[in-house]
Amino acid sequence: MPKKQKKLSFLLFLSGLLLVACGKEGHSQIVAINNETEYEEVVAKDVAYLYFGFDDCPYCKEFRPILEEELMETGQIAYYYNTKKRVNDANYDEVLDTYGVEFVPLLVRLENGKAVGSVNLDTVADLPALLAAE
């Protein structure tokens, strides 16, 4: 094989490897809620996990990697309710009141729209049990 073909083959291989690696990195077990309709769809599920927080919250930055790791291990998905981005939603106060959100981060387990358990940064050790609850 000529030198030019070897170089081209090698570059194509590296490009493919890079594409595969980048594609895997973008996948997250945490899905953002972008509007009120998406929120309603989440709470209509039999079982769902609702994660309250905001991007520049230092406690959320500590909590989120722990949450992501546990979600990956259990195959669960959490729906992210960004308390700063959703503040103008008509149902914002109702949502926070319904789940007793006084501070973030907070992960709430919902069963048929009702909160049946939650964890925060102080109780993060209980996260595996919350995600494994039947």
Question: Residue locations for each model-derived region?
Answer:
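Non-catalytic, surface beta->alpha helical segment in thiol-disulfide oxidoreductase systems
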Residues: V108-E134
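Local sequence-structure signature of Cys/Sec-based thiol-disulfide redox active-site neighborhoods
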Residues: Y39-Q76
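Bacterial N-terminal signal peptides that target proteins for export
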Residues: P2-F10
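Thiol-based oxidoreductase modules, predominantly thioredoxin-like and allied folds used
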Residues: Q76-A90
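C-terminal motif of bacterial Sec signal peptides marking the signal peptidase cleavage site
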Residues: L18-A21
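Solvent-exposed loop/turn segments at secondary-structure junctions
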Residues: D55-Y59, K84-R86, K114-A115
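Proteins that catalyze or organize thiol-disulfide redox chemistry
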Residues: P2, G23-Y49, D56, E134
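Structural micro-motif
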Residues: L96-V108
